[in-house]
Every structure is written in C-alpha cells, then in structure tokens.
C-alpha cells in the first residue's frame, strides 16, 4: 500500500517530527507478496572478503554433518558464529542510503519499496586455523611405495585436489601449502604420500651420489642427478625428494637448475627413522647413532627435533622419545590437556614447539600460555602447569 505526501506529513505531525529536520525523500515500505521469513541469511564481511566477492571470487562453506561449519576464501579459513541483533534487520532492494540522495531535493519525494525479508541475527566471521588433521590420515590409506609396488585397482582411495577440498575444512591455498609441508606428491593427478621407508630410500640414493661425485650439499646439479639415478627410481620421484629436502636454485653461470640441500631437514628425517620404532631411546646413545647415520659432513643438533621428539631430562639416564605435533589434538584446550597429561610441568622451550601452530593472528606463545597455563619458578626456571584440573 502506497502513501501520499499528505499522509506522510500527517504521520510526521502525530510523531511530532519537523519535516525540515529530515531529507525530503521518504521510503514507504510494504511486504512483498511472496515474502516468507527465513529466506535470507546475513553475513558480515571484512573489506578483504568484500573486495573478493565484488571481483567475482567465491566463498565456500565446508564441513561434514558432524563438523562445525567454516567458511573458506581462496587463501583463508573463517569460523562461522551466529550473532543476534537487538533490532530487526530488513532486506529492502531499491532502498537508497543518504549518500545516494541529492542534498537539496524538492519537493517531498516518496519511494515505494518492498521488504523482501528480515532477520534478527547474522553470521559473524572469525579467522581460524584450517582443520588439516584428517588430511594425512586420508592420504595414509594409500601411500606410494614405488612403481613396482602399485596396485592395479586403487582409484577409490586416491584423491584429487577437488576431492580433498570437499573433505577438508581449509582454503585451497592452505590445503596445497600443507600438502607440500607433509611431502605429498601429485602423481597422475592424485595426491599421494610417499611411504616413509621409500622416501628415505630416495634420499639415500641422492646422498650416496653426492658422496661419490664429491658434490657440495649446497650445489646438487639436477640434470646430472636425474641422469645418474633414473635407472634406480623414476625421475619425478628423485626431483620430488630433492624438492622436499632442498631448495631449487638457478646457476647464474650455466643457467641450469641445482638444489641446495637443507641439513636440518635431512637430520630431522634421519632422527624420525631412528625413533619411530622405539618407545624411548637413551639420549646419549641416540645422539651417537644419529650423528653416525646422517651423511658425512652434516651435523646433528637437538634443536633440529623441535615438534618431533621430546627429551626427558629427569630420567636417569636421560631419554628421548618420538612426540610429533601432528599427532596431538587440533583443539587448543584438548592439546594443552594432552601435554599436561604427559608432563605436569613444562619449560617454555619444551612446550613451545607443540603449541606454536595454535597461535592465532598476532597472538604470541606467551599469550597462549598465560591463557591456558599457570607459571611458577623452580630452581630459577619458569615452568608451566595446567590451569584446569586434569581428570
């Protein structure tokens, strides 16, 4: 139902509102004939997401029925939370805001608008960590152990990038970055994890060749490496292993590709090989065997094992055992409960590698410890224990 200018002025008089205090444009609102509540949802976006939507990019809501839904852009993941409003929010196509109206509009103008929907809540977005724990478990169902060990029928347990995006709560960039971090390899369009023993076999071929050719670890020529090892393993596997344990560079003189191997990554992988089948390892014996096991010229250090292994200085003799960050719960409180269940008190240097990935944007490890742990001094060392009683 539309209103005349006279009816609008009469309503303003009843409300004791002076027309001169208002703009000379009035919106007359009516409900749409096909209006039904609950047809629309509102979502609050920051400037970055707004620009992505305006540019034609997509936002995707991901999660199984049992998951808490998250929203993903191309490179970030956001937690979705419903926020209630005290006022009813109306959806009015064609409604003009003050900046869209002329300042000196005369005379009184009436714009008839239909209310298409309403809501008393909206979706609030908060940046969160991608939920990637399930990814490695999926890929471990069918690891790659060399061409001679491939099964003929295995497509049901193989996954493309699109398959993984439908199962993992992460953005495309976060997913691909994590696939690279866990050394996954794209084989015939499917993402595969190399069997760890096979990966170490590839690495051993490379380090033995480096030794026989007297190459520097910082300059391993890719073409020669592929040519020498192609009779042993597929070239793409050799190159993948070099990518996992080194950095590709260009020789300024020849223009050829070469790799600079990362000592820390190779020492870390060797330690994992030694520790994975032992419950605990005498620390002194482990350090001796570890140094003997890495390629000659490389030096092992305990700080290479952050987030992979934990040293127990209280036992006699001192011991070391495998404790991987990726095996701990993703939820922050559950992570702290698990860690404090293993050890009542932690020094910051020991616990930091296991909670670093929990820090949000602009959040420090110290702030995280303040929130979830209590500190105390023992023999001049600050130690942290759980804020909550552990069941």
Curated annotation (Swiss-Prot):
InterPro entries: Dcc1 (IPR019128). Its main location: nucleus. It is found in: Nucleus. Component of the ctf18-RFC complex which consists of ctf18, ctf8, dscc1 and the RFC complex. Loads pcna onto primed templates regulating velocity, spacing and restart activity of replication forks. May couple DNA replication to sister chromatid cohesion. Belongs to the DCC1 family. This is Sister chromatid cohesion protein DCC1.
């Amino acid at each position: 139902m539309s209103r005349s200018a006279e009816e609008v002025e009469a309503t303003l008089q009843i409300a004791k509102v002076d027309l001169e205090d208002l703009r000379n444009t009035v919106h007359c609102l009516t409900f749409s004939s096909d209006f039904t509540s609950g047809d629309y949802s509102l979502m609050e976006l920051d400037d970055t997401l707004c620009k992505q939507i305006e540019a034609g990019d997509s936002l995707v809501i991901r999660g199984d029925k049992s998951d808490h839904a998250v929203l993903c852009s191309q490179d970030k993941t956001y937690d979705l939370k419903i926020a209630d409003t005290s006022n009813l929010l109306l959806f009015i196509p064609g409604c003009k805001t003050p900046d869209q109206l002329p300042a000196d509009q005369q005379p009184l103008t009436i714009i008839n608008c239909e209310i298409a929907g309403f809501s008393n809540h909206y979706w609030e977005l908060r940046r969160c960590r991608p939920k990637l724990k399930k990814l490695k478990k999926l890929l471990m169902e069918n690891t790659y152990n060399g061409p001679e060990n491939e099964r003929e029928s295995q497509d049901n347990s193989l996954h493309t990038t699109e398959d993984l995006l439908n199962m993992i709560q992460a953005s495309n960039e976060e997913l691909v970055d994590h696939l690279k971090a866990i050394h996954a390899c794209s084989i015939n369009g499917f993402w595969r994890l190399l069997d760890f023993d096979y990966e170490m076999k590839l690495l051993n071929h490379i380090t033995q060749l480096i030794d026989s050719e007297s190459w520097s670890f910082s300059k391993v020529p890719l073409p020669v490496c592929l040519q020498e090892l192609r009779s042993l393993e597929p070239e793409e596997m050799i190159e993948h292993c070099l990518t996992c344990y080194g950095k590709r560079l260009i020789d300024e003189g020849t223009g050829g590709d070469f790799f600079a191997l990362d000592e820390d990554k190779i020492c870390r992988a060797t330690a994992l090989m030694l520790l994975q089948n032992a419950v605990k390892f005498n620390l002194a014996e482990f350090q001796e065997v570890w140094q003997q096991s890495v390629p000659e010229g490389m030096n092992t250090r305990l700080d290479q094992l952050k987030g992979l292994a934990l040293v127990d200085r209280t036992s006699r003799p001192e011991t070391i055992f495998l404790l991987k960050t990726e095996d701990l719960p993703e939820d922050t409180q559950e992570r702290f409960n698990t860690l404090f269940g293993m050890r009542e008190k932690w020094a910051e240097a020991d616990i930091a590698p296991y909670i670093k990935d929990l820090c949000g944007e602009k959040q420090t490890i110290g702030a995280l410890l303040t929130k979830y742990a209590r500190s105390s001094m023992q023999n001049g060392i600050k130690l942290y224990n759980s804020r909550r009683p552990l069941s």
